[in-house]
């Protein structure tokens, strides 16, 4: 009877408490500490003995292996990098679609963008001497292109500004709720009628 209880306790402890991996067998309980005779057991026999544990642990996946910090960190880093790269195209698409509020913002932004490479060019002057032809043609076509659409954009935003103005007259729709004065009138009538009905009912 006592041996069965001891065996049940050992089995329960084997399933309940995860032990750190031993050098002989990774991640599973090594019974060589229990008996002196089992110290001579080969790793293959231990694997055969521990196959139920392997099956049980494969059924119940440990949270540390499946929810490790490395995949989450890698996932976050992978998400951050595309977001940063997508912000620039998104700003350009927003600027192209919404000309009205962005046109005043574009004009100051373009000089700022032009000012940002200037310090970079001054600091990178030694590298530009090595490759003077490659960066200059790449930067010059990009700068005239935003400058040329800017004079055209003030011509285009004027029609979209007019659709924005009709949106402002649309808020007169909320004034269509002058029904609010009517509810106070009805409760006043009811308040006057309620005390009379209550008094008659009480009498």
Curated annotation (Swiss-Prot):
Domain of life: Eukaryota
GO molecular function: structural constituent of tooth enamel
Keyword tags: Biomineralization, Extracellular matrix, Repeat, Secreted, Signal
One family name in Pfam for this protein: Amelogenin
Region Disordered, annotated ranges: 116-180
GO CC, alphabetical: collagen-containing extracellular matrix; extracellular region
GO biological process, one term: enamel mineralization
Compositionally biased tracts (Pro residues): 143-180
N-terminal signal peptide: 1-16
Biased composition (Polar residues): 120-130
Annotated localization: Secreted, Extracellular space, Extracellular matrix
Composition bias, Low complexity: 131-142
Function comment: Plays a role in biomineralization. Seems to regulate the formation of crystallites during the secretory stage of tooth enamel development. Thought to play a major role in the structural organization and mineralization of developing enamel.
Family in the record: Belongs to the amelogenin family.
PANTHER family: AMELOGENIN, Y ISOFORM (PTHR46794:SF6)
Protein name: Amelogenin, Y isoform
Organism this protein belongs to: Pan troglodytes
């Amino acid at each position: 009877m006592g041996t069965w209880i001891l065996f049940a306790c050992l089995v329960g402890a084997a399933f309940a408490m995860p032990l750190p991996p031993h050098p002989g067998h990774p991640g599973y309980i090594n019974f060589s500490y229990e008996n002196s005779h089992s110290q001579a057991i080969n790793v293959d026999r231990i694997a055969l003995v521990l196959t139920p544990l392997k099956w049980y642990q494969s059924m119940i996946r440990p949270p540390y292996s499946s929810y490790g910090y490395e995949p989450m960190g890698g996932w976050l880093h992978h998400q951050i990098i595309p977001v940063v790269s997508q912000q620039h195209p998104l700003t350009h698409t927003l600027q192209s679609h919404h000309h009205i509020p962005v046109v005043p913002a574009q004009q100051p932004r373009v000089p700022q963008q032009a000012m940002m490479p200037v310090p970079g060019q001054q600091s990178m002057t030694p590298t530009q001497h090595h490759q003077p032809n490659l960066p200059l043609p790449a930067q010059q076509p990009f700068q005239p292109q935003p400058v040329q659409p800017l004079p055209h954009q003030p011509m285009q935003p004027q029609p979209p500004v007019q659709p924005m103005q009709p949106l402002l007259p649309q808020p007169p729709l909320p004034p269509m709720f002058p029904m609010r004065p009517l509810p106070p009138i009805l409760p006043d009538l009811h308040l006057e009628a309620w005390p009379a009905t209550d008094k008659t009912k009480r009498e």
